[in-house]
């Protein structure tokens, strides 16, 4: 079980006050999503005018949003020009607990996050020279290699809720099958859509932002808009439907989007029976190995401090690991991973 959460908004359509609230709700969404995964936290920020930024950390989300990188590097990038933000909290199943395996994944034209389990990810043939350790990365690599979504879904057996963007930086895609939840709500005045794995996560994130505004940090009209948003109906994604949100079409009256039905192989039992997995159980996916508490340490090349791996943040845009203490690059070749 993982948490997916984020937003899609029309660029340059918000007031500075609305932008601050969007930042606060984004932070709250990650914190509330911690209940769905504590092994890593990640966020992708997509801007129509520049290259996407992806930040990953082995911190749980409540600690991630307290980090220096969150305050100094991530929050400023959530700007008026931002169009899509993809957030993720991971509970590791396939693949070790490492920054390399943390979401979001950048696979060519695709940046995506996934909640669920793909049972045949080792059978997905995208690159014969590459075996994907994480099922989620295999899915997005498949999406990148084939623009025909139905053909991609025909290859996938498992359960999933997916959030991704393609080359079109102003468009968010959401898709789920019956085994995984996903919900969204639209703030019309700010022309922004928020989404999360559960209705409760969305409600809590918005309610906490309302309380922040009530403490005198905001203005009266923002406070009124937020409570209006809190009372707005939270929508559930229909099963096996692709929702495409083009932020250029967002209005201050209604949410305009497209939806299209697909056929999915979502019943995990079918795949297990078909492949005669008589010994299928949670240990097949390595749950038991993720409860070890001892973390390896590494030396920072700049400040020579011994650092826990969870205190290092990976900046995917710069392909480098950043020391939490001195904020300088650690070692670009380092594969940070929990010792097993």
Residue ranges with predicted function:
Residues 1-340:
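Conserved short alpha-helical segments that host acidic/polar catalytic motifs at enzyme active sites
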